A protein has these predicted regions:
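Solvent-exposed loop/turn segments flanking beta-strands in beta-repeat/beta-sandwich domains
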Residues: 36-51
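Short S/T/G- and acidic-enriched coil/turn segments that sit immediately N-terminal to beta-strands
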Residues: 58-63
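Helical hinge/lid and interdomain linker segments adjacent to catalytic or ligand-binding clefts
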Residues: 102-207
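Catalytic beta-strand/loop cores that center a nucleophilic Ser/Cys/Thr
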Residues: 221-332
């Protein structure tokens, strides 16, 4: 999917296209570009990249660049009204390269997964990514070549402990995954696995944490994630939330994740962020400090948080040392298998995950 970093240039003319996304087709070097047309008749649409202008009919909604080179592309889409006037130019970036994704696990094979949430996540992954591979930590310890993968996904969700398993802490495993991330590989980490960003040295700020395990409890509420950080930073446009519907709650934009019923509530979140810098929870300068010092982007908090007290989901940006991007999803409401009932918001769990994987594949 597109990175979501959109640049617009205003000029007189018609309305611009919306929701431009670029995705590398799995197993190929083809780039599929899609967009939504404005509510007016167009004479043509142009796709622009590498000093090329591809002219399409006014009703075109997609274009494919075939056999693209392994490099970063900046792709623009421009629409023209019936008078021939061009719209604002909308650009998005994509880096073409490997597309293979691996699902990490402790057990030797996928069949050995016992946790219900980890199993549900694995089932969804292999149904939606048939070219994906299961990769155990023992295989990594024995020298598996991680350079063949674009993204590694690890969900660790334990009822018994929040500690990371010994297999993941083997020095050879830590060093291999660290090198993968240093070299530009993407990481998607769920629940207790978000702590691995500290294990490999990407995150260093010693924020207070709230990591929980246990069997859970019955609860009649719908739990959401707040994506309007501090009521000032609207993350609904971030690519991992593409296609998800949000609603207003107490001046915040929230996305529902789990409905009434049994909840394990396995949080893996970081809190007292502002206190770490001796700043107030409502201080905008604290948000800037948190973001810039660790080179992160806070993507979600609990739905009752109105300030910068904590972060539940976040993105780590490339740094001078680590060229890779990571998405950490630690909010307790992000539960892959709701016990004893069907989660009416399961599609939001799945769509966020799909978006995150595709987003990381563009980096």
């Amino acid at each position: 999917y597109s990175t979501g970093q959109t640049i617009s240039f205003t000029r007189e003319g018609g309305a611009s296209v919306q929701d431009v996304i670029a995705q590398q087709v799995d197993g190929t070097n083809n780039i599929q570009i899609k967009w939504v047309l404005p509510n007016e008749k167009l004479s043509k649409v142009e796709v622009r990249y590498d000093n090329k202008k591809i002219e399409l009919k006014g009703d075109a909604v997609n274009y494919t660049i075939e056999n693209a080179a392994n490099k970063k592309y900046t792709i623009g889409v421009v629409s023209f009204n019936e008078e021939g006037q061009s719209s604002e130019s909308v650009y998005t970036d994509i880096r073409v390269g490997k597309t293979k994704v691996a699902f990490l696990g402790v057990t030797p094979t996928r069949d050995g997964i016992t946790d219900d949430d980890e199993k549900a996540a694995a089932d969804w992954f292999f149904n939606n990514y048939p070219t994906g591979e299961y990769l155990s930590f023992d295989e990594i310890a024995n020298g598996a070549d991680l350079s063949q993968y674009r993204v590694l996904w690890w969900i660790r969700d334990s009822q018994q402990t929040t500690d990371l398993p010994a297999e993941s802490l083997d020095p050879s495993v830590v060093e291999a995954i660290k090198k993968f991330h240093i070299d530009g590989g993407g990481l998607l980490l769920n629940t207790h696995a978000v702590a691995y960003l500290y294990t490999i040295g990407r995150m260093k700020a010693k924020f207070n944490t709230e990591f929980t395990s246990g069997d859970g409890f019955d609860n009649g509420d719908t739990w959401n994630m707040n994506v309007y950080i501090g009521k000032a930073h609207d993350e609904t446009s971030h690519p991992i939330y593409r296609g998800l519907e949000w609603k207003w709650m107490d001046g915040k934009k929230v996305i529902p994740l789990i409905g009434a019923g049994w909840k394990e509530n396995h949080n893996s979140i970081y809190k007292d962020l502002c206190m770490y810098y001796n700043m107030n929870n409502t201080d905008e300068n604290a948000y800037v400090k948190i973001s810039e010092d660790s080179q992160i982007r806070i993507l979600a908090t609990w739905d009752g948080i109105n300030d910068y007290f904590m972060m539940a989901n976040y993105e780590t940006l490339p740094t001078e040392e680590f060229k890779g991007t990571a998405i950490a999803i630690g909010i307790g409401a992000f539960e892959w298998n709701q016990n004893r009932s069907v989660n009416p918001y399961q599609k939001n769990i799945e769509q966020t995950t799909h978006n995150a994987i595709e987003y990381l594949k563009t980096k």
